[in-house]
């Protein structure tokens, strides 16, 4: 078993369901300390955070990731114990195997190999790790970046070890992410008897025309790097359960994944205009979980593509698809951000797994990126 695979297994054994870390940062921190990293814990209980640096000055190349995992789900649906790594036919099974304890192991072993060869590298090699990525994402990377900005400490390049690959390791590199705007909508009507609709005001009927317009609206056409903006209703509830009662209230949750063609203010104004025009009586709460970001071609994306090409033979597709990541908290500070990791086919699923060969290849790619950017 290679060092990276062994470390992946050691981390999987720690049931770090968000926001718990279960000692994962201690394991990684001890290895980094042996390399003479300056380790700083920036915890906001119960969230654990590690900011570790080797070297001084700029450029600062940061590897970022999270130790927390989503719950395993029903144990009986797993072929193996989700927190006891099992290897079958070159594949390791366990919660967090792909998302993203293999990524953490790969970047740690890559750092060990790189520093052994280049102890006096230029600039700074840094790690930013948290146990609050799968949860609210309030006291993790978001808060650590606030601390660093206040000092000020600036990251130049950041590699997020999220599982970015689709069919083959390295086939996809994320160079940005769409923004995420959510709304919590309450439509106020008047409850009544279904036989006397003139004495009531049905909130479902009030919202329906506006919702139809929102659901079919073309927000934009996207651009060469971003898909078009999308609007989706995620939750909708109204009524008492009785067949003869007009509901007095409707609650809805919706989400917009938006490109760089949009702004939060513009979308909020559009939605309120549509609701007002349809004379909907409502209250609306907004939640912005991240703004869109995009890393333009440059040293980081070049190094990433070169490393992928050298060790896989693939020309990586540069993509901004998928959900949000902690890159959304790092990019606004001016850092260039990419995401490169193992396959994402089984993340958040039962029987989550990772190919052991991919973990070792990821180590090689990460080490090569360190060489290209810090030597």
Where are these regions (language model features)?
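Fold-level recognition of mixed alpha/beta catalytic cores in primary-metabolism enzymes, strongest
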Residues: 98, 102-213, 351-361
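Structural motif
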Residues: 59-62, 91, 126, 156-158, ...
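Acidic-glycine-rich active-site phosphate/pyrophosphate-binding loop
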Residues: 72-87, 155, 159, 176-186, ...
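A structural signal for isolated positions on well-ordered beta-strands in alpha/beta enzyme cores
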Residues: 40, 124-128, 283
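Metal-dependent amide/peptide-bond hydrolase catalytic core
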Residues: 163-168, 175, 181-375
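Acidic/His- and Gly-rich active-site-bordering loop/insert found
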Residues: 1-95, 115-122
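Short, small-residue-enriched loops and turns at beta-alpha junctions
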Residues: 14, 18-19, 133-135, 240-241, ...
């Amino acid at each position: 078993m290679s060092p990276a695979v062994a470390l992946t297994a050691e981390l999987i054994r720690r049931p770090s369901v968000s926001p718990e870390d279960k000692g994962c940062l201690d394991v990684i921190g001890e290895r980094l300390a042996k390399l003479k990293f300056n380790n700083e814990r920036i915890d906001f209980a119960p969230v654990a955070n590690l900011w570790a640096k080797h070297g001084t000055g700029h450029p600062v190349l940061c590897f970022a990731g999270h130790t927390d995992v989503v719950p395993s789900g029903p144990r009986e649906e797993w072929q193996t114990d989700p927190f006891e790594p099992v290897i079958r036919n070159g594949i390791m099974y366990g919660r967090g195997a792909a998302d993203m304890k293999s990524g953490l192991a790969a970047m740690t072993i890559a750092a060990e190999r790189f520093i052994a060869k280049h102890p006096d590298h230029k600039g700074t090699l840094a790690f930013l790790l948290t146990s609050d990525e799968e949860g609210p994402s309030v006291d993790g990377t978001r808060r650590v970046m606030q601390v660093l900005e206040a000092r000020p400490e600036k990251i130049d390049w950041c590699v997020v070890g999220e599982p970015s690959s689709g069919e083959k390791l390295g086939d996809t590199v994320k160079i940005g992410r769409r923004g995420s705007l959510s709304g919590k909508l309450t439509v106020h009507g008047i409850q009544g008897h279904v036989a006397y609709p003139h004495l009531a005001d049905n909130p479902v009927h009030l919202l329906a025309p506006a919702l139809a317009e929102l659901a079919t609206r073309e927000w934009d056409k996207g651009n060469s790097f971003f898909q078009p903006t999308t609007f989706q209703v995620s939750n909708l509830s109204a009524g008492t359960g009785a067949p003869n009662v007009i509901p007095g209230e409707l609650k809805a949750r919706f989400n917009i994944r938006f490109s760089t063609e949009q702004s939060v203010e513009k979308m909020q104004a559009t939605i309120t205009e549509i609701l007002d025009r349809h004379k909907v009586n409502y209250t609306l709460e907004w939640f912005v979980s991240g703004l869109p970001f995009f890393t333009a071609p440059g040293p980081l994306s070049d190094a990433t593509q070169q490393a992928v090409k050298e060790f896989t033979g693939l020309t990586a597709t540069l993509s901004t698809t998928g959900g949000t990541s902690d890159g959304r908290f790092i990019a606004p500070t001016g850092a260039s951000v990419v995401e490169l990791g193992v396959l994402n086919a089984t993340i958040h699923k039962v029987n989550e797994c990772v190919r052991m060969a991919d973990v070792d290849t990821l180590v090689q790619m990460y080490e090569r990126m360190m060489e290209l950017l810090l030597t």
